[in-house]
């Protein structure tokens, strides 16, 4: 059963083994923790309606892989020193972690920001295995995604196969996300 392992402030705290890892990265309040709970089918990640609650790299065990929930990027309501700390945690993990096999960028489907686009470009240039998870599909009509999928893919400069639309709230397409993660871990 999936479970929380630990929170890490720096690379000194990371688990030292060779188990494959994926990470979730996204703006504050896009539902990364809720998505982890939906994947686990249990409440293993703390959730909050307040943006910026995840301020460490949180490690979760999912049997064949670990999932790391990184702090949200772009959250403005923190001090400059805290912003620097959060950026350092993200950068250290993204650039130094040898276990990392894929990055899943979580984006709120109703609000794709310039910062999301910039991060997508940066991650695409760094990783072959960079996927987009459009969360909060429950907030949009199904026809919105069907009618706008090609535009969204073009805007994000991603192939359609590298994008999945989900709802952590009502678990729409969670099986498809699990299948994608499984294909990456093999």
Curated annotation (Swiss-Prot):
The gene is engB. It comes from the Bacteria. GO terms for biological process: division septum assembly. This is Probable GTP-binding protein EngB. Keywords: Cell cycle, Cell division, GTP-binding, Magnesium, Metal-binding, Nucleotide-binding, Septation. It holds the Pfam family MMR_HSR1. PROSITE patterns: G_ENGB. The keyword Aminoacyl-tRNA synthetase does not apply. GO terms for molecular function: GTP binding; metal ion binding. Its cofactor is Mg(2+).
